[in-house]
Amino acid sequence: MAGHSKWANTRHRKAAQDAKRGKIFTKIIRELVTAAKLGGGDPDANPRLRAAVDKALSNNMTRDTLNRAIARGVGGDDDANMETIIYEGYGPGGTAIMVECLSDNRNRTVAEVRHAFSKCGGNLGTDGSVAYLFSKKGVISFEKGDEDTIMEAALEAGAEDVVTYDDGAIDVYTAWEEMGKVRDALENAGLKADSAEVSMIPSTKADMDAETAPKLLRLIDMLEDCDDVQEVYHNGEISDEVAATLE
């Protein structure tokens, strides 16, 4: 399956993500601790933990750091007394947004999330208001690669779909519980992915224009700056032309 330029939807956010690397590590460690606490310390027997490990490695976290986080979770560290909360809402241009949080205080978290939505021209919705537009999937990404080789190996390993973008990037989609197994199979075939993570994939896209795109990006940045927010998923689509105006 072919797709538009993936780069257009990521390049304008890379610098901001790099600047937030310390906060990203903190959030990944929190997820590692929680996943190990809830499902045990063996990634092969704990899909949520395996997904967190893959994300940690994709973000260049050292094995020593992630192993310490897993040990904290297995040992009952206080940081593991968290619950996963999903908030749903609408952003600029009618975008559907899902915000995944890990929190020990619902009141604090919902206040921060609601503030970000209202500040950026969006609004927090009710449970189920946009969730039906998203499916939880594993996404294994290659910046470049041979489409036929990756597709053959991925589908043989149990992947659900392979998408090639105009700029040469390739995404392999899997059932989220199977992502680790498929990634291992690809690596055994000599195909090392640039990243692997569990994501919420939208079934429809909302096209952003030069007015709504920066507003959406501001909302995403505000949400990601909240300590309790782990991930922000949305269905906004930014074209190459609009992305060029953001640089």
Swiss-Prot record:
Top-rank taxon, per record: Bacteria
Location of the protein in the cell: Cytoplasm
Gene3D superfamilies listed in its UniProt record: 1.10.10.200, 3.30.70.980
UniProt KW DNA-binding keyword: yes
InterPro entries (alphabetical): Integrase-like_N, TACO1_YebC-like_2nd/3rd_dom, TACO1_YebC_N, Transcrip_reg_TACO1-like, Transcrip_reg_TACO1-like_dom3, YebC-like
Keywords, comma-separated and alphabetical: Cytoplasm, DNA-binding, Transcription, Transcription regulation
Region described as Disordered: spans on this chain: 1-20
A Pfam family assignment: Transcrip_reg
UniProt GO molecular function: DNA binding
GO biological process, one term: regulation of DNA-templated transcription
SUPFAM superfamilies, per the entry: YebC-like (SSF75625)
Single GO cellular component term: cytosol
Major localisation: cytoplasm
PANTHER family, per the entry: TRANSCRIPTIONAL REGULATORY PROTEIN YEBC-RELATED, TRANSLATIONAL ACTIVATOR OF CYTOCHROME C OXIDASE 1
Family membership noted in the UniProt record: Belongs to the TACO1 family.
Name assigned to this protein: Probable transcriptional regulatory protein YebC
Lineage of the organism: Bacteria, Pseudomonadati, Pseudomonadota, Gammaproteobacteria, Enterobacterales
Gene transcribed to yield this protein: yebC
